[in-house]
Amino acid sequence: MGKVVGIDLGTTNSCVAVMEGGKPVVIANAEGFRTTPSVVAYTKNQDQLVGQIAKRQAVMNTDNTFYSAKRFVGRRVDEVNEESKEVSYEVEKSGSNVRLKCPVLDKQFSPEEVSAQVLRKLAEDAGKYLGENVTQAVITVPAYFNDSQRQATKDAGKIAGLEVLRIINEPTAAALAYGLDKKSNERILVFDLGGGTFDVSVLEVGDGVFEVLSTSGDTHLGGDDFDKVIVDHLAATFKANEGIDLRQDKQALQRLTEAAEKAKIELSSATQSEINLPFITATSEGPKHLDLTLTRAKFEELASKLIDRCRVPVEQALKDAKLSSGELDEIVMVGGSSRMPAVQELVKRVTGKDPNQTVNPDEVVAVGAAIQGGVLAGEVKDILLLDVTPLSLGVETLGGVMTKMITRNTTVPTKKSETYSTAVDGQTNVEIHVLQGEREMASDNKSLGTFRLDGIPPAPRGVPQIEVTFDIDANGILSVNAKDKGSGKEQSISITGASTLSENEVEKMVKDAETNASADKEKRERIDIKNQAETLVYQAEKQLGELADKVDADSKAKVEDKRVKLKAAIEKDDFDAMKSLLEELQQELYTVGASVYQQAGAAAAESGADAGAAGAGDSSSGDDVIDAEFTESK
């Protein structure tokens, strides 16, 4: 079994880690950073960009730069009305599914495809670090992700060419990282406020056992929402002063969003932030600039409702765990947004404890995922992880009521069976509507899909006995089995609608991604060759200029000939010619370099011989010789 990496696939940033020598190690990306922006872009030349390079060009390429895709993964169009208004790219519908429009390619992407590109980059960068292909991963999801979102995350991994060995909840991963070396039992609350989601989990940790007691959260709350209140404030202030709504201009909106994120981060350590956006727009009177000071107090006032929304899941998680805040030993803060002083103050007020600051909120989830990967690969021993399902699962019964079969915070994996019957005489099939949520009425909960069991022998209503079994695996993903006890007929059922992508669509995307990866690799190689060629042409010019009087005419002519030919190949984009000429010019430069050193050596030898002859003539007696010790220079 090869190395299993742990990946924190975040809304804003992602991170990858691996177990090395029994310790989790965070892997820096190709650009040298330990986290990678979860951003994918396509340029006018149809080149794909992922990570920091994609984020940097977002202002100039708003329609084709995709970020915060995690907020759309596994969701229907009617579930993301607010989120779709907060991004600069166009969110479209395909049936009831979300699609992200890419004008430059004239196509639509599923959110899973965008997430897959981020996963692929992380896996490739990890592969370069490890010196081997990475094909297996543990990927984290918010604890409050429903079945559709978990399945969609697994699909994203598959599209990226990864075998997803386990989907693990982010707070649980953080607890794994925090509690790996803890011997004594501790009750901890993990407060995970990320870029797009918010989770709270209460766990009992100690001596290798990690038991989740409860989990709660809000998948519509995260750092993006805090950015938005700053964006709205900036836009409203500018409109009041200038009469122009910057939110109607995509480029201006993107600049506002980036400035808001920067200000939010600054206000975690400073009491005020200067926001300067020159040339934000223009009128017939000339360019307009935005210049504003945002204080921490004003930001906290703007975000007060969002901060208050963090309170309820904390209280709910404690209630479900049947614990008081006084029974907690530690509060572990996770996610970049947990750095906000107002958020930390809220946690302190609700729990009565100072948050634990010993873990890195941006990396701890990936570290925990790597530990779980180590457990699955057999590298890490004596770890027992007992997680829970975040939401109740059930079926719709007579009168549109949701009847729960598996209640929230049940330890997974788990299996539960219930027996149902027919509603009318002679009924030969039943349709079962599978739901996830906590509301009493079926229509108020998340529909995971419906299935039919046919071939039931006709009988009076209430007589047939149909046993329905819900089975949740260790990933928190549901499968359903139905059995007619009378006929013994049994059927395993895949719930249609549990994922926003069909199996065929996933397979097609896997093939497309593989094809694109090959094309991207070839494109990257061509760029590298061209860069090497341009560098060598420059070096040749510089070397000939500096060593002009030391290089014979014949050698100089050979270098110049190859240099001119290589420069012509660069201008024509002739990569085959570039490859061969690169080697030839390099060889000529080696020859020139060797010749120069030989000349220098010969001159030094001649000079030494002359000095020796002169010294011999001056020598008188050995009495003047001085003994000295020399140390070797290193």
Swiss-Prot record:
<dbReference type="InterPro" id="IPR043129">
    <property type="entry name" value="ATPase_NBD"/>
</dbReference>
<dbReference type="InterPro" id="IPR012725">
    <property type="entry name" value="Chaperone_DnaK"/>
</dbReference>
<dbReference type="GO" id="GO:0051082">
    <property type="term" value="F:unfolded protein binding"/>
</dbReference>
<dbReference type="InterPro" id="IPR029048">
    <property type="entry name" value="HSP70_C_sf"/>
</dbReference>
<keyword id="KW-0547">Nucleotide-binding</keyword>
<keyword id="KW-0067">ATP-binding</keyword>
<comment type="function">
    <text>Acts as a chaperone.</text>
</comment>
<comment type="similarity">
    <text>Belongs to the heat shock protein 70 family.</text>
</comment>
<dbReference type="InterPro" id="IPR018181">
    <property type="entry name" value="Heat_shock_70_CS"/>
</dbReference>
<keyword id="KW-0346">Stress response</keyword>
<feature type="region of interest" description="Disordered">
    <location>
        <begin position="601"/>
        <end position="634"/>
    </location>
</feature>
<feature type="compositionally biased region" description="Acidic residues">
    <location>
        <begin position="624"/>
        <end position="634"/>
    </location>
</feature>
<feature type="modified residue" description="Phosphothreonine; by autocatalysis">
    <location>
        <position position="197"/>
    </location>
</feature>
<keyword id="KW-0143">Chaperone</keyword>
<feature type="compositionally biased region" description="Low complexity">
    <location>
        <begin position="601"/>
        <end position="623"/>
    </location>
</feature>
<dbReference type="GO" id="GO:0005524">
    <property type="term" value="F:ATP binding"/>
</dbReference>
<protein>
    <recommendedName>
        <fullName>Chaperone protein dnaK2</fullName>
    </recommendedName>
</protein>
<dbReference type="InterPro" id="IPR029047">
    <property type="entry name" value="HSP70_peptide-bd_sf"/>
</dbReference>
<keyword id="KW-0597">Phosphoprotein</keyword>
<dbReference type="InterPro" id="IPR013126">
    <property type="entry name" value="Hsp_70_fam"/>
</dbReference>
<dbReference type="GO" id="GO:0140662">
    <property type="term" value="F:ATP-dependent protein folding chaperone"/>
</dbReference>
<dbReference type="Pfam" id="PF00012">
    <property type="entry name" value="HSP70"/>
</dbReference>
